[in-house]
């Protein structure tokens, strides 16, 4: 963890697929809090012209590139999902680069605290960048329903993703704060506002 007197201090925000991480992060953004999304950073590091994209194409073949020169993220996701060894190779390449992007963007934050949004906050070790950790928790049946609706995925596809994500109990064990997102957006917004006012009272993310 970084020094507790760092300004702004960093809140980690995570949760499983379909938990409402992005919706919660948007609520914080609407309150004037700077956020950095690890998913966005993972896209930046594989943009055309970046060294990581060249290494991926050399390793997996240029069939993973679209006609525009951009990475076919869907094809890559399918390939590594079916091959753990290749997934580990990709993670070893990308995680350090993604973390560099995250640190660079967090350093530009001007709000009283900033947020790192990441679905793999715990698994990737990114939790070491934050002073406090908020988990967006949602019952599994709602995760499945929301993801099927959002991504037009089958129940089997969503359940397969849930199986490879960190177990809910492990995620909750790392949490300083838990927001159970099992109601409507108005309720989510009110809970984020409550947490926001609490976070404004903290120094370095600590009471």
Curated annotation (Swiss-Prot):
- Name the predominant localization: cytoplasm
* Subcellular localization: Cytoplasm
Q: Classify the source by domain of life.
A: Bacteria
Q: Which SUPFAM superfamilies match?
A: P-loop containing nucleoside triphosphate hydrolases
Protein name per its UniProtKB record: Dephospho-CoA kinase
State a GO cellular component annotated for this protein: cytoplasm
| Family from the record | Belongs to the CoaE family.
């Amino acid at each position: 963890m970084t020094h507790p007197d760092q300004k702004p201090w960093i809140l980690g925000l995570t949760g499983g697929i379909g938990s409402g991480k992005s919706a919660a992060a948007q609520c914080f953004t609407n309150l004037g809090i700077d956020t950095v999304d690890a998913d966005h950073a993972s896209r930046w590091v594989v943009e055309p012209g970046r060294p990581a994209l060249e290494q991926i194409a050399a390793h997996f073949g240029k069939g993973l590139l679209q006609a525009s020169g951009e990475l076919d993220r869907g094809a890559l996701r399918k390939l590594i999902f079916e091959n753990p060894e290749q997934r580990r190779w990709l993670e070893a390449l990308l995680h350090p680069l993604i973390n560099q992007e995250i640190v660079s963007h967090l350093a530009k934050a001007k709000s009283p605290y900033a947020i790192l949004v990441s679905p793999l906050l715990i698994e990737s070790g990114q939790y070491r960048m934050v002073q406090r950790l908020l988990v967006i928790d949602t019952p599994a049946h709602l995760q499945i329903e929301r993801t099927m609706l959002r991504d037009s995925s089958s129940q089997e596809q969503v359940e397969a993703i849930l199986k490879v994500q960190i177990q809910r109990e492990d995620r909750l064990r790392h949490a300083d704060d838990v927001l159970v997102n099992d109601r409507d957006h108005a309720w989510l917004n009110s809970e984020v506002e409550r947490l926001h006012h609490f976070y404004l009272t903290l120094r370095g993310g600590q009471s």
